[in-house]
Amino acid sequence: MTSRFPAIAANITKLFAARNTHAVEVAILQPADPFLDMAGEDLRRRIFLTESETGQTLCLRPEFTIPVCLDHISSQAGTPRRYSYLGEVFRQRREGGNEFFQAGIEDLGDRDTAQADARSVADAHALLSLVLPGRSLAVTLGDQGIFEAVLAALGLPRGWRMRLARAFGSAPMLQAALADLANPPRNGQLSGEVAALVLDGDLDGLSTHIAGGMEQAGLSASAGRSPTDIARRLIEKAELRSVRLSNEAFAALKNFLAIHVPLDGAARALETFAAGAGLSLGAALEKFAARAKAIEAHGLPAEKIRYDAAFGRPLDYYTGVVFEIAAQGGERPLAGGGRYDRLLTLLGAKTAIPGVGFSVWLDRIEALREAAP
């Protein structure tokens, strides 16, 4: 390793090699669209954007999961396959530098998702235990799949399920969405003609009306969102406002989000919740229970692992388990990861490839090492 790498880098790469991963390097300059489309609002606003001579929008690499997946697709490598990386990422941050090191593993193509999920948590825990010897670690797990299964079982329409799923991982967004669900805002800001078209769900008529208004105002329909996109969003918002959840269903959703228990009792807590609310969580609960058993089989300290039903991570591509690991009593995560079974298909893979992975923040780890007595 050159001197620009953190002192712990060599030990991390040895661990990666011992865990049967393929070391991969990806370009610092990346096409921006995959990140803008799939990475989530929190990361999107932190990206450093630029433009190529041909007009393509590019960005400095803000994370590794998407570039590693793109590299896998272009290489046409077989699966299952485990990739490891260690390098710099670039994000606008309120604290710390805008350029910092991350390391991690992306585990692609293993159809035994419970075992792959457990292995990812165990890999992250082993890495942190290696570089922070003697430090007590706390693991927090959430599950996007369980959350979406609860929303479906409650009978929420697709638009609301999508909005709440996008908000999962951001406490302010989730609270705002729940507030709107409890008390839908009135649609009083639209003019009479637009309001009528929205109420009728007339996508073509509304698109034509918006296009005419943009033309009169001298606005280019190609400069931003198209008239059809704007019309579709207005109609979707109106449909969301028309839904009011029953008091019983809303109480059930709030009760679900309040579940926060040790992992060894989490499946039982979810079963109790579902039975009390009269809901069937089906395959999502079966997957959850299988994963919990697989994690325990890795010998991780069960008393340090907790399931938080309201816990998510602010990246749009997660579909299942999500997790973070922090020093016991610490406020900032040292590692974070999760499952992203739709991501590779969205990036262009010809067949569905399941994936799960994690990354660690080396600057945060270094700060803890330096502060140790």
From Swiss-Prot:
Output this protein's name: ATP phosphoribosyltransferase regulatory subunit
Q: Which GO terms describe its biological process?
A: histidyl-tRNA aminoacylation; L-histidine biosynthetic process
Any further remarks? This function is generally fulfilled by the C-terminal part of HisG, which is missing in some bacteria such as this one.
Q: Which Pfam families match?
A: tRNA-synt_His
Q: What does this protein do?
A: Required for the first step of histidine biosynthesis. May allow the feedback regulation of ATP phosphoribosyltransferase activity by histidine.
Name the domain of life this protein comes from: Bacteria
- The gene is hisZ
In terms of Gene3D superfamilies, this protein maps to: Bira Bifunctional Protein, Domain 2
Question: Would you tell me the Gene Ontology cellular component terms?
Answer: cytoplasm
Q: Name one GO molecular function term.
A: histidine-tRNA ligase activity
The taxonomic lineage of its organism, from the top, reads: Bacteria, Pseudomonadati, Pseudomonadota, Alphaproteobacteria, Hyphomicrobiales
Identify its protein family: Belongs to the class-II aminoacyl-tRNA synthetase family. HisZ subfamily.
